[in-house]
């Protein structure tokens, strides 16, 4: 009980070393998207080899945060593959290329905050190759995009996301306000 009293209500913070190197690191862009597309093509080959059919006109891609960002990249790289994107809080540029990632675990006795710094954030990059606004400019999008975005998203403000989607064919924005938060499916109006 003595240790619990010492720790009670405290927050501990520390930088976590991410084990990345030149051969294995989170590139956060096109390479990750190509990995996803390769996995999908392998799945398609397995289905074909086993005589299993699927409706090629009903392939959707879903993601949350960085996963939704990757969904947009996959759609841009393979514009006729997906009939739709379900986007939960995608940013338009990889957030962690400009910011450290902070993860907080709130426990009963104390909280632990971890800070991750990705190797890719220190590299010189062609920013346009990561920027969805640039990549979708003039792009003839065929996928229906259904986007869920909170009014208080701290990673990408709603007005920026709305402006982007206004310029993309087939995009529909569902704004998450306090009225939609139910604590189960929708837990906040922030980045979730």
Task: Label the predicted regions.
Residues 1, 95-97, 183-185:
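Short, charged, surface-exposed secondary-structure boundary motifs
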Residues 2-51:
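Alpha/beta-hydrolase active-site loop
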Residues 10, 17, 35-38, 61-63, ...:
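Short linear motifs at secondary-structure transitions and domain/linker junctions
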Residues 24-31, 58-62, 149-156:
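Conserved aromatic-histidine-acidic binding/catalytic patches
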Residues 36, 53-55, 157:
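Short, solvent-exposed coil/turn linker segments
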Residues 41-104:
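Primarily recognizes the serine-hydrolase "nucleophile elbow" in alpha/beta-hydrolase
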Residues 95-176:
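The feature captures the conserved acid-bearing segment of alpha/beta-hydrolase catalytic domains
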Residues 168-192:
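Catalytic histidine neighborhood in serine/cysteine hydrolases
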